[in-house]
UniProtKB/Swiss-Prot annotation:
Pfam families, sorted: Snf7
Gene: SNF7
Location in or out of the cell: Cytoplasm; Endosome membrane
Family: Belongs to the SNF7 family.
Organism: Eremothecium gossypii (strain ATCC 10895 / CBS 109.51 / FGSC 9923 / NRRL Y-1056) (Yeast)
Record note on quaternary structure: A component of the endosomal sorting required for transport complex III (ESCRT-III).
Region described as Disordered: 187-237
Compositionally biased residues, Basic and acidic residues: 226-237
GO CC, alphabetical: cytoplasmic side of plasma membrane; cytosol; ESCRT III complex; multivesicular body
Protein name as annotated: Vacuolar-sorting protein SNF7
Compositional bias segments (type: Polar residues): 198-209
Length: 237
């Protein structure tokens, strides 16, 4: 029962294995880094001892100090390689763990999408959209029916018929005023006076048959000159 609720112990251990490996690798790299610093200090100390013994003329002790320095240097090189290997392994595990977590997240997302789409397909979506369109159209028809006036006969009156009836009433009103005692009879409209061109009293000069008729040329020239003068006056010339 407990394994059903909380999962089996092996599954939990497998899940914690990458984190545990990363933690142990980091701790071991820190330990080796401290060892590197210690060996570097020992190498510096032995080199100073060799210089001291050499200054005192004790070559054997100076040589022994240099040998110890070489031993420390050899150990330091080995530890450097170990640190490099551990760091590469650490980076690989971290990258693999990151990929694993990414895949888990993607898998959960795919499962969620699958669960969402279980009750959906193209046919059902089309049916639902058709139902929505039908309801929208029905709503528009209902709105149009509600906004329609109750007494439609008022809106069906012919406007031309109203205008004719109005004209008849106006004529009747004019006739009634004329028939009243003492009403002034409307005077007829004065005739429009039409001005005709004057006929010259003297005879028109006869033109020779060989010469072109110049009737109206002088008048046209006068009009052109008058138009030219008006234009000059407008331009201030």
């Amino acid at each position: 029962m407990w394994s059903y609720l909380f999962g089996s112990g092996n599954a939990k251990q497998k899940k914690e294995l990458p984190k545990k490996a990363i933690l142990e690798l980091r701790e071991h790299i820190q330990l080796l880094s401290k060892k590197q610093a210690h060996l570097q200090t020992q190498m510096t100390s032995q080199e100073e001892s060799a210089r001291h013994f050499l200054s005192k003329g004790n070559k054997n002790m100076a040589k022994a100090a240099l040998k110890r320095k070489k031993v420390f240097e050899s150990q330091l090189l080995k530890i450097d390689k170990q640190v490099d290997s551990l760091e590469q392994q650490l980076y690989s595990i971290e990258n693999a763990n990151l990929n694993l977590e990414t895949m888990k997240a993607m898998k959960q997302g795919a499962s969620a999408m699958k669960h969402i789409h279980e009750g959906l397909d193209v046919e059902r979506v089309d049916e639902t959209m058709d139902e929505i369109r039908e309801q929208v159209e029905l709503g528009e028809e209902i709105s149009e029916a509600i906004s329609r006036p109750l007494y439609t006969g008022v809106n069906e009156i012919d406007e031309d018929e109203l205008d004719e009836e109005l004209d008849m009433l106006a004529q009747e009103e004019v006739a009634r005023k004329v028939m009243e005692p003492g009403a002034a009879v409307p005077a007829a409209a004065p005739a429009t006076k039409v001005s005709l061109p004057s006929v010259p009293s003297s005879d028109m000069p006869q033109q020779d048959r060989g010469q072109p008729v110049t009737l109206g040329m002088d008048q046209e020239e006068d009009e052109d000159e008058r138009a030219l003068r008006e234009l000059q006056a407008e331009m201030g010339l």
